[in-house]
């Protein structure tokens, strides 16, 4: 009869230990992922002491600057998607809308980061829940950097724990959800009422009547004065472009009033023709507190934008006619590798070509 040696017994014991360790590791992994799902839905479940609620229950009282309704399209698959908040106000609006649209398209639950909530919730009635920091730290994220136009691949993403990155702001991601996006970016009542109060004070110079047509004008200046010519071989909107855009509206609407906002209000006052008495410099230009200027633009009937996501979102939410600055870079600009005009501007918007002669003179023969 064969009797196992001490060596055989030791090897058998080690094999049993290895198999047991693998078994318990798999059990722990399942519990960990289940715990993350529970943590994402129930932040007060003795796991996280986050002050930010991250699951919306119907009928639960909310802060005036928080969401006022539950997500309208719950996810059909497990897992969590989020997006890294980067850039300023308009950038984060684009990131929010893209996250919402792609998560719905792929049947996942979208959560926003607390930093994005802090930027957008004081202005809009957003409904996406906020991700608990504990989940963000421990979740097995896969990252995906988005380019700024919709691709077929983005409709078939399989990762359950996905963190999107980049600066998406193309209507091709979310335009099929336009009414939902407009609902997400509904201004809080006090901002809307304040903006309407400002507009209601304006009078037509010749008759003293209240205007019936307001055209919001956003003039992007600031860091773009340096970035566009030096990095992207591009220009920002100049006085001639703004004059053309305003004349376009004057030819189509009776007595329109132009409500100018900008992060360069001093330049606007010096370079926009006010001789007709139909231009009002209403913006305060406070980049750190954009809510007031944005609310003014959204409450207008139509929009003139130059470049940038702030102007895009003002036009998208205001509706009506939109004039935008077209062909604002040289054909050789590397900006065109990451920016597709046909994916940036709605087909019904009207473009007026930029004057590139200052760049061409700098480039030489």
Swiss-Prot record:
InterPro entries noted in UniProt: Glyco_trans_11
Biological process (GO), any one: fucosylation
Organism name: Sus scrofa
Transmembrane feature ranges: 9-28
Assigned keywords, A-Z: Glycoprotein, Glycosyltransferase, Golgi apparatus, Lipid metabolism, Membrane, Signal-anchor, Transferase, Transmembrane, Transmembrane helix
Family: Belongs to the glycosyltransferase 11 family.
Miscellaneous comment: There are two genes (Fut1 and Fut2) which encode galactoside 2-L-fucosyltransferase. They are expressed in a tissue-specific manner.
Main localization (coarse): Golgi
Protein name: Galactoside alpha-(1,2)-fucosyltransferase 1
Pathway(s) annotated for this protein in UniProt: Protein modification; protein glycosylation
Positions of glycan attachment: 65, 301, 327
Reaction equations catalysed: a beta-D-galactosyl-(1->4)-N-acetyl-beta-D-glucosaminyl derivative + GDP-beta-L-fucose = an alpha-L-Fuc-(1->2)-beta-D-Gal-(1->4)-beta-D-GlcNAc derivative + GDP + H(+); a ganglioside GA1 + GDP-beta-L-fucose = a ganglioside Fuc-GA1 + GDP + H(+); a beta-D-Gal-(1->3)-beta-D-GlcNAc-(1->3)-beta-D-Gal-(1->4)-beta-D-Glc-(1<->1')-Cer(d18:1(4E)) + GDP-beta-L-fucose = alpha-L-fucosyl-(1->2)- beta-D-galactosyl-(1->3)-N-acetyl-beta-D-glucosaminyl-(1->3)-beta-D-galactosyl-(1->4)-beta-D-glucosyl-(1<->1')-N-acylsphing-4-enine + GDP + H(+); a neolactoside nLc4Cer(d18:1(4E)) + GDP-beta-L-fucose = a neolactoside IV(2)-alpha-Fuc-nLc4Cer(d18:1(4E)) + GDP + H(+)
Function: Catalyzes the transfer of L-fucose, from a guanosine diphosphate-beta-L-fucose, to the terminal galactose residue of glycoconjugates through an alpha(1,2) linkage leading to H antigen synthesis that is an intermediate substrate in the synthesis of ABO blood group antigens. H antigen is essential for maturation of the glomerular layer of the main olfactory bulb, in cell migration and early cell-cell contacts during tumor associated angiogenesis. Preferentially fucosylates soluble lactose and to a lesser extent fucosylates glycolipids gangliosides GA1 and GM1a.
Topological domains annotated Cytoplasmic: 1-8
MF GO annotations: alpha-(1,2)-fucosyltransferase activity; galactoside 2-alpha-L-fucosyltransferase activity
UniProt-listed Enzyme Commission number(s): 2.4.1.69, 2.4.1.344
Signal sequence annotation: none
Domain of life of the native organism: Eukaryota
GO CC terms of this entry: Golgi cisterna membrane
A Pfam family assignment: Glyco_transf_11
Lumenal side: 29-365
Membrane topology according to the record: Single-pass type II membrane protein
Compartment(s) where it occurs, according to its Swiss-Prot or TrEMBL record: Golgi apparatus, Golgi stack membrane
């Amino acid at each position: 009869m064969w009797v196992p040696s001490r060596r055989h017994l030791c090897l058998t014991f080690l094999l049993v230990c290895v198999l047991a360790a693998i078994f318990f590791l798999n059990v722990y992994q399942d519990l960990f992922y289940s715990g993350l799902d529970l943590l994402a839905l129930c932040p007060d479940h003795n796991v996280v002491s986050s002050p930010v609620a991250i699951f919306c229950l119907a009928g639960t009282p909310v802060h005036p600057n928080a969401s006022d309704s539950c997500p309208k399209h719950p996810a059909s698959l497990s897992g969590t998607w989020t997006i890294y908040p980067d850039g300023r106000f308009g950038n984060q609006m684009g990131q929010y809308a893209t996250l919402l649209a792609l998560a719905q398209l792929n049947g996942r639950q979208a959560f926003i980061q607390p930093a994005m909530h802090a930027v957008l919730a004081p202005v809009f009635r957003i409904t996406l829940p906020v991700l608990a920091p504990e989940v963000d730290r421990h979740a097995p994220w896969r990252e995906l950097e988005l380019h700024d136009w919709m691709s077929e691949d983005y409709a078939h993403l399989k990762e359950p724990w996905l963190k999107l990155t980049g600066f998406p702001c193309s209507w091709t991601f979310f335009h099929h959800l336009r009414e939902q996006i407009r609902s997400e970016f509904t201004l809080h009542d006090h901002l809307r009422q304040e903006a309407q109060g400002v507009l209601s004070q304006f009078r037509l110079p010749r008759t003293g009547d209240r205007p019936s047509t307001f055209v919001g004008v956003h003039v992007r200046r600031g860091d773009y004065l340096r970035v566009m010519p030096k990095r992207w071989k591009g220009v920002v909107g100049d006085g001639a472009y703004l004059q053309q855009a305003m004349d376009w509206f004057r030819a189509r609407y009776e007595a329109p009033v132009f409500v100018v906002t900008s992060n360069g209000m001093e330049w606007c006052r010096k370079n926009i023709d006010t001789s007709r008495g139909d231009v009002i410099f209403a913006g305060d230009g406070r980049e750190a507190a954009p809510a007031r200027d944005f609310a003014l633009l959204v409450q207008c009937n139509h929009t003139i934008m130059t470049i940038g996501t702030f102007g895009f979102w003002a036009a998208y939410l205001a509706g009506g006619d939109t004039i935008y600055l077209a062909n604002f870079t040289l054909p050789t600009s590397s900006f065109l590798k990451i920016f597709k005009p046909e994916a940036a501007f709605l087909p019904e918007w009207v473009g007026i070509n930029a004057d590139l002669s200052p760049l061409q003179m700098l480039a030489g023969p």
